[in-house]
Amino acid sequence: MRFTLNGAAVDVAVHPMARLLDVLRLDLGLTGTKEGCGEGECGACTVLIDGEPVCSCLVPVAQVEGTAVLSIEGLGDNHPLQHLFMNEVGAQCGICTPGMILAALSVGPTPTLDDIKTALAGNLCRCTGYSAIYRAVMKWREVEHAEGERSSQVSE
C-alpha cells in the first residue's frame, strides 16, 4: 500500500484489510495514535485522511492508498494547539488528546462554541470534561485569526 503519511511517501507491505491504526502503530512505529475502543466510538484513534478526521480503527489500509494521512506525529512538538491543550489543562491522561487535536484541526477559522462541539462530537474524554478542550480550540482559532489579520495588514 502506498500513501502519504505526515508529508512523506510510504509503502507498506501489509494485508489490505489491516486496520490503519495497526499499520501506524505496529508496522510504522507511530504510537501517538491511540486505540481506545477499537469500534469507532471514542475518537482516540482519529487521524486526518485528505484533511478529514477519521477513526483509524475502522479504516482498512487499502482505503488510504493514494491519500494523504496525517497522524499526531505529523504536527511535530510545537503546534500551537498542543501548547494550548496543555495551558488550558485540556489534556490529562493523554489517551484522547491526539485524536482531539487532529479532530480540532477541522474546525473552521472563526468557529462558534457549537462548531467546536460538533467537530469534536466523535471524541470522548473521561478525564477533563470538555470545557478546557473547547477553550483551547477557541483560543487557538482566535490566535490564528488575529495573526492572519496582522499578516494581511503588513502585506498591504
Identify the residue ranges that each predicted region occupies:
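Signature of N-terminal electron-transfer/Fe-S-associated modules in redox systems
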Residues: M1-E156
